[in-house]
Amino acid sequence: MAEIYLAGGCFWGLEEYFSRIEGVKKTTVGYANGQVESTNYQLIHQTDHAETVHLIYDEKRVSLREILLYYFRVIDPLSVNKQGNDVGRQYRTGVYYTNQADKAVIEQVFAEQEKQLGQKIAVELEPLRHYVLAEDYHQDYLKKNPGGYCHINVNDAYQPLVDPGQYEKPTDAELKEQLTQEQYQVTQLSATERPFHNAYNATFEEGIYVDVTTGEPLFFAGDKFESGCGWPSFSRPIAREVLRYYEDKSHGMERIEVRSRSGNAHLGHVFTDGPESAGGLRYCINSAALRFIPKEKMEAEGYAYLLQHMK
């Protein structure tokens, strides 16, 4: 067994979230890395402790790297002393370790996050100090009070975890060699392929769609629907963090551009006219930005970990 301490805003929601992740054996909440050895809920403003979740996990079932990727899924790493509606030093973000060997793993994940975001993150990285177990009524708070306040979606624990470290972006020269002219123009130059006359508009087999530039999984075929727009349409991504969103005012229109996380490839746009029963979104994606992998080939191509999440 191993342990790590994570601060990420109100500890009620963060504890419930991590309690749902396979391999996490025990969670408790407390106050960490303050200026003095003792504190309580009424004093944390004065002692500068952070609301923190203590995780004990089985390294054979979930790694520290995976724990951290789950963590970054539900925090805003750029926000200072604020998560959701909660404001104050006690709601700062931080990763606090007790095993010196963990520091290198944490630093690597931090570096990857900063590279993806293009700026330094506001998450503390420190050895654990002055940890105080929180009062009993805070422990498993949302299990005792299912309708209680929570600033995160704890069901995000059930979304597939896609590790961006497995899907590195090739160099521009490699992309020019690997991709067709249309694939390169769409993904690297934000071009748009012709509607209806593209590879996957009418494809509805079981499987997954991955970023053509990196192989990072983006969409389940089960979330694809016929929209009539002429391009592949999806109601949601495999996991929300695999996509990036940008304001697009090109061609005299105001749209939300969708790009891939690891490859930074232009994929298409997202609109709010999708099926209401599936959340109301329509991800309108260029076939040229995707590669389809049939369900029967997923294991051979390294995507077996996603099979359990397919509809």
From Swiss-Prot:
Ranges for domain MsrB: 172-295
Record PROSITE patterns: MSRB
GO biological process: protein modification process; protein repair; response to oxidative stress
Keyword field contains Oxidoreductase: yes
Catalytic function, reaction form: L-methionyl-[protein] + [thioredoxin]-disulfide + H2O = L-methionyl-(S)-S-oxide-[protein] + [thioredoxin]-dithiol; [thioredoxin]-disulfide + L-methionine + H2O = L-methionine (S)-S-oxide + [thioredoxin]-dithiol; L-methionyl-[protein] + [thioredoxin]-disulfide + H2O = L-methionyl-(R)-S-oxide-[protein] + [thioredoxin]-dithiol
Active site: C10, C284
Domain of life of the source: Bacteria
EC number(s) per entry: 1.8.4.11, 1.8.4.12
GO cellular component terms, A-Z: cytoplasm
Name assigned to this protein: Peptide methionine sulfoxide reductase MsrA/MsrB
Species, as recorded: Streptococcus gordonii (strain Challis / ATCC 35105 / BCRC 15272 / CH1 / DL1 / V288)
High-level lineage: Bacteria, Bacillati, Bacillota, Bacilli, Lactobacillales
